[in-house]
């Protein structure tokens, strides 16, 4: 149910997905949904965001553990995103910005769930940078730049229907890392 609802929320946005659409896609009754999520659709969204958080951070951690430096790991993540976009035409497993922009100002619990994911990703980046010899202060700043650059490039790729923004940061981010 969470995987199906996550895809619906990512494709259409929270407000555009009706409860009946979720029930039909998941082939469950309203009672079953409310049994698992007594607070309804918003509680389901938060569960979807938590699941997405786990999947994304597990993948990023895996990639970062496979590469010796932040520069190599960052390049590998960006290349994976480019491949996903070129192969599948989507980045749905990696971004949830549409949900953030739609819901963050309306629901504190959704904003908190979204914020947790961004914090975890930034923490993964920061830890790798510190392991590479960056000071804590520099690692915090550079990890924020990395997160904002990658997330922004993903949004631009989707709106432009092009992988060029990710390809651009694939070139520029390693240069930024070298300059520190």
Model-predicted segments: where are they?
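Amphipathic alpha-helical packing segments from all-alpha helical-bundle domains
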Residues: 57, 105-132, 141-144, 171
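Amphipathic C-terminal alpha-helical segment
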Residues: 84-87, 105, 127, 147-164, ...
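Short hydrophobic clusters on alpha-helical segments that form packing/core surfaces
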Residues: 1-9, 81, 150
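Generic hydrophobic, amphipathic alpha-helix propensity
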Residues: 1-5, 22, 48-52, 56, ...
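Helix-turn-helix
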Residues: 4-43, 47
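Amphipathic alpha-helical segments used for helix-helix packing
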Residues: 72-76, 87-109
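Hydrophobic alpha-helical connector segments
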Residues: 61-88, 143-146
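All-alpha amphipathic helical-bundle segments outside canonical DNA-binding/catalytic cores
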Residues: 72-75, 112-113, 131-147, 156, ...
